[in-house]
UniProtKB/Swiss-Prot annotation:
This is Putative membrane protein insertion efficiency factor. The keyword Cell inner membrane applies. Keywords: Cell inner membrane, Cell membrane, Membrane. One of its GO terms (cellular component) is plasma membrane. It is found in: Cell inner membrane. Could be involved in insertion of integral membrane proteins into the membrane. The lineage of its organism: Bacteria, Pseudomonadati, Bacteroidota, Bacteroidia, Bacteroidales. SMART domains: Haemolytic (SM01234). Belongs to the UPF0161 family. InterPro entries: Membr_insert_effic_factor_YidD (IPR002696). It comes from Phocaeicola vulgatus (strain ATCC 8482 / DSM 1447 / JCM 5826 / CCUG 4940 / NBRC 14291 / NCTC 11154). Pfam families: YidD.
Length: 73
């Protein structure tokens, strides 16, 4: 069940990386990028904690937020 939910959560990220991201300039302030972070967080921590970590990271990615190296815990 967790694998199915993880897969469903990763689909929009893969869609974004394949179709939307190539048409926009690079803007993520962090390394790894927010989409890479989301994929790694969901694969490493499962769908619930991974989604929480990914959303938290995306909310921090703005001009007045932090920047730099921020690995998945």
């Amino acid at each position: 069940m967790k694998k199915i939910l993880s897969y469903l959560l990763l689909l929009p990220v893969y869609f974004y990386r394949g179709y939307i991201s190539p048409m926009t300039p690079p803007s993520c302030r962090f390394v790894p990028t927010c989409s890479e972070y989301a994929i790694e967080a969901i694969k490493k921590h499962g769908p619930f904690k991974g989604l929480y970590l990914a959303v938290r990271r995306i909310l921090r990615c703005h001009p007045w937020g932090g920047s730099g190296y921020d690995p998945v815990p």
